[in-house]
Amino acid sequence: MKVDVIKLDGKKAGSVDLDEALFGLEPRADILHRVVRWQRNNAQAGTHKVKTRREVSYSTKKIYRQKGTGGARHGARSAPIFRGGGVYKGPTPRSHGHELTKKFRKLGLRHALSAKAAEGRLVVIESIAMDEAKTSALAKQVKEMGWKRALIIDGSDVDANFAQAARNIEGLDVLPTMGANVYDILKRDTLVITKAGVEALEARLK
């Protein structure tokens, strides 16, 4: 599929042929859902923890005598039925991550790229190289382009001046090719890829 290429100032800079196997698939929500869940589960800290009966700070002494009170029989104050007592089978620290094959992860990335192309929200830019790291100048260009929530994917290395200028612009994320992932692509409204990024993605996802 042929897509127009633009410069950072918005002017046209020719066109590029995109691989149909990467950008021309029929997006499948089930594949995207599985990959996003895998990403988010792996990112979850899993540090949740409550105190069990043996961990709460209470004496193990019987709270009152067994018989003659007219009340129910009880032992220690740390029992789960009491306020402030230990929690029975509560959450403990654990990993929420699960396995997903490399082949399936690559497939998910192809479908994410295809989804943006199908929505008409894929932009190919010639280069994002800047002479100096000026946030104000880049913010003005981004506003003129209409990129309110955009992910920009560069080649193997992101231009240092551009990365510094973009760091303080709200709604703008910049990643190298190896950092491209399904969750970040779907999270942003517009996907912007440099020509170097397109070549690197095609090499990565062969």
Curated annotation (Swiss-Prot):
InterPro entries on file: Ribosomal_uL4, Ribosomal_uL4-like, Ribosomal_uL4_dom_sf
Pfam families: Ribosomal_L4
GO (cellular component) term, any one: ribosome
GO biological process: translation
Key words of the record: Ribonucleoprotein, Ribosomal protein, RNA-binding, rRNA-binding
SUPFAM superfamilies listed in its UniProt record: Ribosomal protein L4 (SSF52166)
GO molecular function terms attached to this record: rRNA binding; structural constituent of ribosome
Signal peptide coordinates: none
Function: One of the primary rRNA binding proteins, this protein initially binds near the 5'-end of the 23S rRNA. It is important during the early stages of 50S assembly. It makes multiple contacts with different domains of the 23S rRNA in the assembled 50S subunit and ribosome.
Membership in a protein family: Belongs to the universal ribosomal protein uL4 family.
SUBUNIT field: Part of the 50S ribosomal subunit.
NCBIfam families for the chain: rplD_bact
Protein name stated in the entry: Large ribosomal subunit protein uL4
Natural source organism: Jannaschia sp. (strain CCS1)
Record gene name: rplD
